[in-house]
Amino acid sequence: MTTLENPEMQAQLLSAALPYMQRYENKHVVVKYGGHAMGNPELGKAFARDVALLKQSGVNPIVVHGGGPQIQAMLTKLGIESRFEGGLRVTDEKTVEVVEMVLAGSINKEIVALINAEGEWAIGLCGKDGNMVFAQKAHKTVIDPDSNIEKVLDLGFVGEPAEVDRTLLDLLARSEMIPVIAPVAPGRDGHTYNINADTFAGAIAGALAATRLLFLTNVPGVLDKDKKLIKELSVADAQALIRDGTISGGMIPKVETCIDAIRRGVEGVVILNGKTPHSVLLELFTEHGAGTLIVP
């Protein structure tokens, strides 16, 4: 008999989870969903079930999602070539139309449907809805390898959050609805901007003073030099690990986004493996969690 088939074990698991459920009751938890988990139907169903259970447990979950691979697939299908500056994609007018169509259209509604299939009320949004988020043009700089001079890149309609209004999200929380948000937002200049989903999630979580911001990735979390999972880090610890090279490569911007979210008012940010089924529940409702927690 497995644990799930054993009533006594089920009762023990629920009893152990109860204090954590009480801890997060009526609290905002923002989950950034993307990466490999999004491309796996079974993991997608497990994620939707986790989000539904959070709501049923009294938590206020907010889902922010990406969709880079799906955007690229649609651009290829439409014969739109991608242009890069300094290794970063330039989002021109045609591209941002596709980005909005894929993110706020197909992907967003797929996630909404999965959560609704679990008996909850999810609603698909983007930054444009209710003037929730206004963007400003993002400015990126690189060092020219030939001249060693800093160069400002024009990435087109790539933006960053400039203003976040939580009014709509508070209304939805009181209405028992689950927001699923695509990282697309208008600028005060009238243009539409594509925003990095991690950055967007951090801004939403900061505006809500969320108890937790969870980043679902394709790695277990932050690893030490022996490749073992670090369960908890302070901001100062994380910065030290960046300086000494323990945190490197693509993990650096992820951790820097976590640090920025904490500075915006988030209580704790977690990097965890979205490929692990029910990793969201394991992180929030078990003693040892499931990833790396970064705190002030």
Swiss-Prot record:
Family under the similarity heading: Belongs to the acetylglutamate kinase family. ArgB subfamily.
Pathway(s) it belongs to: Amino-acid biosynthesis; L-arginine biosynthesis; N(2)-acetyl-L-ornithine from L-glutamate: step 2/4
Subcellular location: Cytoplasm
Biological role: Catalyzes the ATP-dependent phosphorylation of N-acetyl-L-glutamate.
Enzyme kind, highest EC tier: transferase
Protein name as annotated: Acetylglutamate kinase
Lineage: Bacteria, Pseudomonadati, Pseudomonadota, Alphaproteobacteria, Hyphomicrobiales
Catalytic activity: N-acetyl-L-glutamate + ATP = N-acetyl-L-glutamyl 5-phosphate + ADP
Gene: argB
Molecular-function annotations in GO: acetylglutamate kinase activity; ATP binding
Binding site for substrate: G67, G68, R89, N194
